[in-house]
Amino acid sequence: MAALTQNPQFKKLQTWYHEHRSDLNLRRLFEGDKDRFNHFSLNLNTNHGRILLDYSKNLVTEAVMQMLVDLAKSRGVEAARERMFNGEKINFTEDRAVLHVALRNRSNTPILVDGKDVMPEVNRVLEKMKSFCKRVRSGEWKGYSGKSITDVINIGIGGSDLGPLMVTEALKPYSAEGPRVWFVSNIDGTHIAKTLATLNPESSLFIIASKTFTTQETITNAETAKEWFLQSAKDPSAVAKHFVALSTNTTKVKEFGIDPQNMFEFWDWVGGRYSLWSAIGLSIALHVGFDNFEQLLSGAHWMDQHFRTTPLEKNAPVLLALLGIWYINFFGCETHAMLPYDQYLHRFAAYFQQGDMESNGKYITKSGTRVDHQTGPIVWGEPGTNGQHAFYQLIHQGTKMIPCDFLIPVQTQHPIRKGLHHKILLANFLAQTEALMKGKSTEEARKELQAAGKSPEDFEKLLPHKVFEGNRPTNSIVFTKLTPFILGALIAMYEHKIFVQGVIWDINSFDQWGVELGKQLAKKIEPELDGSSPVTSHDSSTNGLINFIKQEREARSQ
């Protein structure tokens, strides 16, 4: 594929941007088109509620949106989409298909990898998960002392942790009949020590989530958990009743002491950051029930169908992707804020930090050359209204343009005080996007200060600080209620957004070689931390850091 910056549609957008950038004033755009909301919004009607994508508060015109859609078409987005859904090995650096869509393929339409339909295997694992969840949640599954399971501890890292953690937090209102869930990921011993201190080994079930069963952080934490467990259980055979594996390495699983019958498989065409739909989601299913887990899958499948069949002009993931391209590659924006106005979504931005930054944080194209344009943004965010009292100042009056996605449910899970809390939350959500769009003019600020009776001295001093330029772009994503179905649809929407941007940038969104180098060096450094001899095998900084740590440890041990 030719370089993005040489693409005729890209050049057309560049020319338009340089000629018309100064004309893109959101106040004027709204004043000039009283129907702008209807022209730049999308209503997605599902059987489980509606999702509204309002992208009217973006620095775009109908001409810009059409040029962006033309760019997507010229970069082969539609063909790439079909290659993914058809099971082609689009992750070419690892020679793998990319089929998280198969994990939630509720239609059961055959999906082939190397000529073999993967759906029978997908359904077999789902049935196994369903049966296991029923036994644990009903109390039929007993621990070594005859007690039922009250706590499930998921030990994994990256995609084996972030997805299940985010979803179990988001769907807490649906967990009343399920066991509590805990997540241990960090190799820092504090994480597992603090978690184990709260647990009873007799009623704890550990899920060890590692495809290879060799991930250093996960296996170290798993061995620590097993050691803690056996201090109470004494008998190694009891491990089989309290540990299950999400893996493909039967030999290592058996060596650990886990019954292979309690090993739940997934496949090399499931990328870690897209794996919550697979057996990696076992902690989700245990916590909220398998029926709700299936609803999560169904919501994602609904979005998959929308993404696959809807024209690009009305396609939610595509529109989000194109708006991101507009800001990153033309306005020079470097970050993207995800701001969910729902406390249950407090891990949503963290989840998509991995989803987006590990996928599109690349500078090499599929042809092996360095890109000559920006790629993936820095993704960050916190729930509203907390963020308003932390970093919104910079979004409103800072020197950086930060495109934002605001998300909120119309219905709250907790209508306490006759819905007062949620009404205030909704008002803040609506006010922020309006404020970022409109700002406050010098004249408006002047009238405000006059009405407040400020002295001439205060007036002159305060006026510049009271002005808001506005013209800050936002998307508003409003949905009926945060249900398993709607959550599944929202996650899939952002997954496909990331995919579309990767296609336009001509990068492989499904490998993660950037994770490897640090791990390789850590293996070399680990034995160098033993003993007291100074280390000289690295650069002066790394040598100095290692030797400082060794000196401090030795001094404290004397």
UniProtKB/Swiss-Prot annotation:
Its main location: cytoplasm. InterPro entries: G6P_Isomerase, G6P_Isomerase_C, Phosphoglucose_isomerase_CS, SIS_dom_sf, SIS_PGI_1, SIS_PGI_2. It is found in: Cytoplasm; Secreted. One of its GO terms (cellular component) is cytosol. Transmembrane segments: none annotated. Its EC number is 5.3.1.9. It comes from the Eukaryota. The modification N-acetylalanine is found at residue 2. Homodimer in the catalytically active form, monomer in the secreted form. This is Glucose-6-phosphate isomerase. The lineage of its organism: Eukaryota, Metazoa, Chordata, Craniata, Vertebrata.
